[in-house]
Amino acid sequence: MKLQKITQKRWFWPLVCAVSVVFGWWYLSIVTCAPLGGDDELINLQNYYYITHTSFGQSVLDYLGDLWEQFSLQNGRFRPFSSPPVRGLTSWFLGDLVGYRLYILAWTYADIVLTAWLVGKASRSKKLGIACLCLLPMMFSVWQDSTGNSLYSYGALVQSTLLPALVAGLAVLRWQDTGHKRWAVLAGYCMFQCCATFEIGFTYIVPIFGLAWLYTDKARDALRLSIPALLGECVTLAFNMGARLMNTLRAAGILAGSVSQIEGISPNFDLPAILRTWAMQMSAGFPLNAMLFGKMRPGKIYPVDVLCGVMVAGAAVAALAALDKLPNKKQNLLLFLSGLAMVSAPALLIGLSPKYQQPGQVDWRHGYIPQTVESFGVGLMALAVLVMLLRWARGKSWWPGGRAVLYGLLAVCMAGSVVWQRAATRSAYDQGGRAYTVFGDGVAAGLAADCGDTPVVTDYMIWGGHEVAENAFFLRYGDLDADAHALQVWRTEDHADDEAVYRVGFTLGQDRHYDIAWCGLGHGADPDVLTDVEVWLPAGTFLYDVLYYTTADDEEVRREVYLDKNGTMITLDGEILADSIRLAAH
């Protein structure tokens, strides 16, 4: 059956969309194996503990109080809808590593769907919008974004910034169709919320204008449609400037109140530094850039990686092959430039920041968190380039006989990108995610629950070993207000040889079914010999395993363990070398 006949079937386009969404989600969800990164290591713990220990009514009142603090200009930055600085009900999604990542992925996919919808609407081609839907999941730098960047960090900050901008874009096009002012009002409000979430929102007026131009085919009409969105931005800008002015007055002692430190987001007009940081930030938004510069190998490839690659790439190539009517050159140029604006404009804001102009903050493979939404712009640019190549190839005499080969090569390249990123992400981060999970399970099961005022040191370093973060971890998982320290930091300090300290650690086995956590009482700056040792074997550990450990007199002990399906706590007698505790197959 010819391709044209297949694409005309009623089931073809719904099937392409379903395959793309299902396997695109599966592909991007690989980073649920990675540990938390950046400020999430502290903020997630604090906010989840807060929401689970506060009544619903009080949490609503606290949220309204935080909003009032923002709208009354008591903070140096006007970000009332930002996440995670403002406490809110979304804190319920911060407690579980996998659940948190899936929550952010839901935001990301909502943006993907809205971007595709907006492209399809602006180009007056639903098929082009579906092609955009299929391409976008492959545009993210999954390996590099897995921990410390916002595709999977910072409470979906940039995703929740982009979403109202996309709604504003759809609203102005609807206003053009109907003439109803309510759509203009909606666009204005959405841009207000966008800019009041994160400052990169101010740049989205540019792609909105570009897509409005694509829709109307006239720059003048596009300017008219952009006015409501621009007014929404102006309102936010007024609040933002007001907040900075009030903060300056408080810093000068003219007004009472605390002063916010906002030097890192105040612009620095050092042109060479701006251009260098701008270029580096833009480069980080391209999907394979970090892996190529980092010479990252894929590691072990599983059949599921190949399946995801084949299905995601297959859906994208099928959508491109079925494009029977391509945008003209002007429309395609506007689509490309709109994508370029989504890449370059947020990156320019980062380039203006004195904080990120400093060496080491941004490089050719690592950008700040806006790089995630820059990837949406890369997707629009890639779509425009592919459309241009399709138009060129379809005009050649060799196209009818060679198109199958070219589509196959394109599919192989796309699938290879997906397989490479997915396998590399698992290889790079799987052990970190396993360590975080089993360590948290052990604390939740009661390890160190009886420590009292005795200090606790942890083998797993939270937020660089910061004591506030270490304490927050025990509060979150064990409801325990512990005097917690990172073992690496503890060993650099002076401690008496007889100073008692509990050590909580973990040992990773051959796979997650052999991961364990343990706790014991040691002494001094190097608590390597422990007594009163408890070992936690979490749910999911294989039955009939063997626990190995070595005593202080170098005797290796082999102990068979029989596990409960909900997890098992085992007590060991004598003096035991902490680093010798491990679980293995029978």
Residues covered by each model-derived region:
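Membrane-interface transmembrane helices that cradle and orient dolichyl/undecaprenyl
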Residues: S160-A184, R220
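Transmembrane-helix signature of polytopic, membrane-embedded enzymes
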Residues: V119-Q144, L163
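Multi-pass, polyprenyl lipid-linked donor-dependent membrane glycosyltransferases
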Residues: Q144-V167, T197, V373
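Membrane-interface alpha helices of multi-pass inner-membrane proteins
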Residues: R182-E199
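Perimembrane helix-loop-helix junctions
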Residues: T203-L237, G242, M246
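Transmembrane alpha-helix segments characteristic
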Residues: L135, P327-Q358, Y407-M414
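Intrinsically disordered, polar/acidic, low-complexity terminal segments
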Residues: Q4, Q8-A131, D221-E233, N247-L333, ...
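Hydrophobic/aromatic-rich transmembrane helices and adjacent perimembrane loops
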Residues: L157-V158, Q357-M388
